[in-house]
Structure formats: C-alpha cells, structure tokens
Amino acid sequence: MSKKITIIDYGMGNLYSVQNALRSIGAEPVVTSDAAVIAQAEKILLPGVGAFGDCMANLEKSGLIPVIMDSLHSGKPFLGICLGMQLLFEGSDEAPGVKGLGFFKGKVRLLRTELKIPHMGWNKLE
C-alpha cells in the first residue's frame, strides 16, 4: 500500500503541521487544492483550524466540495482532523444556518459550560 496521503488545502488549516507529522512517521504527504489530484488520491486528509462558517465558505469558493463528497462516498480512507471532521456533519452550533458537507447525519453541538472540558493545547515541562 502506498505511503502517499493527500492533504486538502482549502486556504485554512494546519497544513504544514500535519504534513510534518506525517513525514515523521514515514508517510509521503502531498498538499494540494487541485481537484484532479484529490480525485486520484488513495488516502485523503482534511485538516482544520478556524471557524466552521469560514471553512465551508472557502470549500465552496474553491470548488472542492464535489470532489470531497465523491471521495467520501467512494470508501477510500478519509480522515478529518478537528474542524476537518466537524465539516463532515450537517452543521454546527458555531455557525447557525451554515450547512456542513452533510456526509454524517447530525450537528456538531457546543459543550455545555457545566461539563468538564478536556484540556487541549501545550504545557511547558521543566
């Protein structure tokens, strides 16, 4: 099986952090916004850092939604990271009225403030 993993560049996201992480484990990442390259990819990664509404707007503007949906329905390996995963749902509390890709039924919901939120981020060790 090929070590090549195609990372979708839609103008937002942590592209180069993901690219470096994949390289560190021996993968061969390809960063692209070219629909033809994405269509031919064996494995696809949709990264994400940003706001749900802005990301969906960028995907629409870039014309990548059809090739993403075709890839998802084809059954080839597809990984959404963080916001990239959230975009696969029908919508998000973060952007009321903005439709997601709708591959998964449901909406990304905001965690209630009385729930304990897991720690995310980096800590400095000495």
Locations of regions flagged by a protein language model:
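Catalytic nucleophile loop
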Residues: 44-47, 72-90
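An anion/phosphate-binding loop that grips the pyrophosphate of nucleotide cofactors and donors
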Residues: 41
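Generic structural signal for residues in well-ordered beta-strands
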Residues: 29-31, 108
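Glycine/threonine-rich flexible loop motifs
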Residues: 53-62, 90-93
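Pocket-forming structural segment of enzyme catalytic cores
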Residues: 90-126
